[in-house]
Amino acid sequence: MGVSANLFVKQRGSTTALKQPKEIGFYSRTKDEEYLISDDTNLNYYYLPDAELDRKLDLSSGFQKFKDYYKDFEDRCSLRGLLETIESSERHKGKKINADIITFRGIARKLISCAFDSPSFNTVDLRIVSFNGQLFIKEVPEAVNAAKASSATEAGRNINQDLNVFTGYKFETLATLSNPLQYTPREVIEKRTKRIVSHGDEYISVVRTGVGNCKLILGAEVDCIFDFKENGRDNLKHYAELKCTQQVANISDTHKFERKLFRTWLQCFLVGIPRIIYGFKDDHYVLKTVEEFSTEEVPVLLKNNNPQVGSACLEAIKWYGLLTEWLLKMIPRDEDPHSQIRAFKLVFENNHLRLSEIEESDEEYSGLIDGEHILSNGFKEWRKSLK
């Protein structure tokens, strides 16, 4: 009988100790699903002067020409770029990276959100492999598709909802340049409003961080550099998160925005992105204002305005500490890279995280253990070659 365990999501740990996030690498993933390690080709640079707002920028412009390459990816949840970046770092240092859990920021955020959201709003369907003393966590691609289909069905999705999603990508397109300002021709700057908006190219920062005694490596998509990039240095302090939302017009809107800001804070604090920039649009999708928030000041801001949401920041950290500690306690980890890999399923249902070991008779077993559903053969061989 394999490992099986449940964790009630209303439980909290006592730890609030966080390790300072540090960038250990980065890569670009292209719209053609190529992974360019230590390559910042897809890194964008923030540029949105206040004067631009006077132009009444239309965030719905270009909706019909939107290109979503991401939906056609063969494996949109792939750990390949993350693993190749880790291997590159290990080859440089000649030793295995010191970490307990390796995954994406989005997965860590989903697990933390279990303490605040229902399974219908926050679908969690993860696979975990225990290899070489570390846990590698990946989302099931089918779960991503199902979650999107479910939310679309429940909401009675219409063109306005697709348009609202598009305005987020449009805001990013209007607010960023592909190169630093000094290297960007005036013609490119002036024609930004005409650029075709697409979704597929990504720049990913790979960050070492931790909570309590658990050390994590998280991959996180970065929207842009706010000021300048330092070559060969940790650039976390220069990154910014871009978001777009509806104007705040009344108390109800305020509470809705506070909940959004909490989720954005969660995204940013996990990997140490210090700056959040929100664009606010009116009912006609015109960009009206842009506001900047300091990630570290968001908990204080929320606490002063809405104590209930403000207390969620500390609750999130306590739950983060507990759930990572629980995973490390429940899942056996053998340091020997030649030992048998073990695979597990983690889902969120009925107010519990449910962990179960995947047995040899399960149809997923072969792909997770012997195949490349999570770990590539190249990465497994690399680890076996490390002394």
From Swiss-Prot:
One of its GO terms (molecular function) is phosphodiesterase decapping endonuclease activity. It holds the Pfam family RAI1. Disulfide bonds: none annotated. Substrate binds at residues 221, 243, 267. Divalent metal cation. Present with 4030 molecules/cell in log phase SD medium. Decapping enzyme for NAD-capped RNAs: specifically hydrolyzes the nicotinamide adenine dinucleotide (NAD) cap from a subset of RNAs by removing the entire NAD moiety from the 5'-end of an NAD-capped RNA. The NAD-cap is present at the 5'-end of some RNAs and snoRNAs. In contrast to the canonical 5'-end N7 methylguanosine (m7G) cap, the NAD cap promotes mRNA decay. Also acts as a non-canonical decapping enzyme that removes the entire cap structure of m7G capped or incompletely capped RNAs. InterPro entries: RAI1, RAI1-like_fam. This is Decapping nuclease RAI1. The lineage of its organism: Eukaryota, Fungi, Dikarya, Ascomycota, Saccharomycotina. Its main location: nucleus. Residues 273-387 are annotated as: Interaction with RAT1. One of its GO terms (biological process) is cleavage in ITS2 between 5.8S rRNA and LSU-rRNA of tricistronic rRNA transcript (SSU-rRNA, 5.8S rRNA, LSU-rRNA). Belongs to the DXO/Dom3Z family. It catalyses: a 5'-end NAD(+)-phospho-ribonucleoside in mRNA + H2O = a 5'-end phospho-ribonucleoside in mRNA + NAD(+) + H(+); a 5'-end (N(7)-methyl 5'-triphosphoguanosine)-ribonucleoside-ribonucleotide in mRNA + H2O = a (N(7)-methyl 5'-triphosphoguanosine)-nucleoside + a 5'-end phospho-ribonucleoside in mRNA + H(+); a 5'-end triphospho-ribonucleoside in mRNA + H2O = a 5'-end phospho-ribonucleoside in mRNA + diphosphate + H(+). Interacts with RAT1, RTT103 and pre-60S ribosomal subunits. Interacts with RAT1; the interaction is direct, stabilizes RAT1 protein structure and stimulates its exoribonuclease activity. The interaction also stimulates RAI1 pyrophosphohydrolase activity, probably by recruiting it to mRNA substrates. Keywords: Hydrolase, Metal-binding, mRNA processing, Nuclease, Nucleotide-binding, Nucleus, Phosphoprotein, RNA-binding, rRNA processing, Transcription, Transcription regulation, Transcription termination. GO terms for cellular component: cytosol; Las1 complex; nucleus; RNA polymerase II termination complex. Its EC number is 3.6.1.-. The modification Phosphoserine is found at residue 198. The keyword Kinase does not apply. It comes from Saccharomyces cerevisiae (strain ATCC 204508 / S288c) (Baker's yeast). The gene is RAI1. A divalent metal cation binds at residues 172, 223, 241-242. It is found in: Nucleus. Its cofactor is a divalent metal cation.
